[in-house]
Amino acid sequence: MFLEIRGIKKSFGSGDSKVDVLRGLDLDIAKGEFCVLLGPSGSGKSTLLNIIGGIESADDGSISIEGERLADMKEKKLSQYRRKHLGYIFQMYNLIPNLTVRENIEVGAYLSDRPLDVDELLHTLGLFEHQRKLPNQLSGGQQQRTAIGRAIVKNPDILLCDEPTGALDYNTSKEILKLIETVNQKYGNTVVMVTHNDAIKDMADRVVKLRDGMIRKNYQNEHKIPASDLEW
């Protein structure tokens, strides 16, 4: 199995204020799979995503990628792995304001020894004609496309998406979801997406529903639908 999550536990605080955010999660995600993590606020989905990405550490349990445990990696190797093999897309775009679209994407390319072709990616993103613009000259959707480009140009094994459409309107959200779908299908990256939008589950290969720090449902979609057909 490509991504193996075993017995992951995480809590915050101590004593009477201690909150168990993750309560012993087990999950397998296949290479190239599009997995959606669903759940209400406080269910632990973003914390799980951060642990997969090495941003936070678990209190107990293990995460292995292609058989290698993240906990066994020394800090330098873990940092290199995050830079080279993980791509992050957040609700906030976090673009470098004084760099153009192209330059923002090239920042990601510099971190990889196997980057995608920037020109080809700009065409895929629908940004080729906007590549010389600065972030403040872009719409919200264009800024998020640029952020996706910066994440995917590294050709990461895993693309981690935390509410990537949370700050966007309906039409722009669908465009971004179609783009992430295209990236997953074209480049074969494993996608793990956190969302509170229940409709997005219908485009996923795997759906994992969390509540109170536990997995309540975990199933594969037999008849997933394209992002363009989603409605909410």
Show the residue positions of the predicted features.
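ABC family nucleotide-binding domain
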Residues: 2-204, 209
